[in-house]
Amino acid sequence: MYKEINNIETYFHNFESIESNKKSVLFIAGAGMDHKFVRALNLQDDEFNPPLVIDLPGHGETQDSSKNKIEEYSGFLSEALMDFKISNLTICGYSMGGLIALDLILGKKFPAKSLILLNSIAPMMVSSSLIELANKGNSFAADFIIKYGLSKNLIGIKNTFPSNANQVMLDDLTACRNYQPNKELFSEIGIPVNIILGGKDRLIDPDQAEVFARNLSSKIYKIDNAGHFPFFEDPVDLSNIIKSIT
């Protein structure tokens, strides 16, 4: 379904299928991605609504241009969710989406019963070389992320990233690099926070992840046979973990 948010035609994935008696998980996509990243997930139909996604500005089916600040994305999602009263909601942010989800919760911008950070920690280390590649074009940045993030060969994985000539990847990666959450607010989150990481993800430092988890008083779940793309590398294990913690 589509709605206009701040004069932006916005795509809401599966929102027309929400049943109030079921659990809901709002997924927030990573850099350059859109609602298609959840297509391999399998949550129980009798217990869960289909995966919910709102395409960010300049991503997927949503109009306008991408942003280079996490706070702009979280503010947009806050506005987009304003008209919805979704009970029993978990927010699950993937990579960049994890930073957006964290900012939503820290800013009390939308109520949720729990938070899942998928392949996402803060601060997020984004190298200068990756920024330079993104400045050359979306496909160059995508190649880098796939090279160091993917644990196995998957045909078509690059199709999850934008192939056009805009600067979506540059904006998104800049937003990730510059985002610094207010750690003083961590103790005020007030809901369970769980972190899911791929055991073969070379884009996230495991020691930094441990420090981040301690700061949030959260538990880390690891998918041993996945890298930075568990929703494609091991969607069954990922789906089972999500079901067990929501």
Please identify what each model-predicted range represents.
Residues 202-208:
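Conserved alpha/beta-hydrolase "acid-adjacent" motif
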Residues 99-142:
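Flexible "cap/lid" loop of the alpha/beta hydrolase fold
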Residues 189, 195-197, 201:
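Short beta-strand/loop motif that positions the catalytic acidic residue
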Residues 29-31, 89, 93-98, 198:
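Conserved alpha/beta-hydrolase "nucleophile elbow" surrounding the catalytic nucleophile
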Residues 8-63:
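Conserved HGGG/HGGXW glycine-rich cap/lid loop of the alpha/beta-hydrolase fold
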Residues 132-188:
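Conserved alpha/beta-hydrolase catalytic His-Asp/Glu region
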Residues 36-40, 50-92, 240:
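Active-site loop/oxyanion-hole signature of alpha/beta-hydrolase fold enzymes
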Residues 226-239:
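Catalytic histidine-centered segment of alpha/beta-hydrolase-like enzymes
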